[in-house]
Amino acid sequence: MSKHHMEKLTCPSCHHDGDFEVWDSINTVLDPEMKEKVLNQSIFLYTCPNCGENFRLNYPILYHQMEDLVMIYLVPESEVEKTYEIFFEKNALADFHTEKYLNRIVTSANQLVEKIQIFDAGKDDRMLELVKLLATDSILKNDPDIEFDELRFAVDDDGTNILVIINKGEITGAVDIDNMYEFASSHCDDFKDLRDDEDIVINLSLIHISEPTRRRGISCAVFC
């Protein structure tokens, strides 16, 4: 079930107190309308009732897309290891193990949204982290002077899978990745089935590229 509670907040602009609804967990079967509020990140937005200023808040949340057996935990960076250990404690969340849930831990609202979009598109997030490496290499070869902070998965209006190029919080371009995804998939046949893999923290920092793979020009990476 979805859980939420109210918290008192003081506006940092006008110092007026107001109420903010904090969602501890969201179940998209029981509350289907909440999925869009997660995707547009409005559940993290507080509007001061006095001055009208908007403020973005970050707080932990468990996102449960029960119809697809997907659970994504948004926690602070400092809580990742603890959350991982709790999840794999003996008998902890046993039903979710037996049902082959797809579980992930993320540390930002943007990562949460990206994971939802990846799984809704039927993609493997492990493979997409490899695609980001390929895309980064391609972008820099075409424009060595380009500056960007992040590549983030999205689905274009016409259904094309893309990586948006983000620099200083602004989208500055996009890359069509369907061919790169197919290429990476064809060269990486040693991954476990997505729902059999016990790794639940998947990002670029967890990828090690093996030397034989480097020589082939594609990363069949080891996630650890």
What are these language model-derived features?
Residues 1-76:
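N-terminal cysteine/histidine-rich coordination modules
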Residues 181-195:
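Electrostatic, structured charged patches in enzyme active sites and in nucleic-acid/phosphate-binding
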Residues 194-206:
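Conserved phosphate-interacting/catalytic interface
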Residues 207-224:
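Single conserved hydrophobic/aromatic residue that forms the stacking wall/gate
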Residues 80-84, 169-176:
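Short, surface-exposed beta-strand/loop "edge" segments at domain boundaries and coil↔beta transitions
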Residues 137-140, 145-147:
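Long, low-hydrophobicity ectodomains and other hydrophilic envelope-associated domains
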Residues 47-135:
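Domain-exit/linker segments immediately C-terminal to small folded modules
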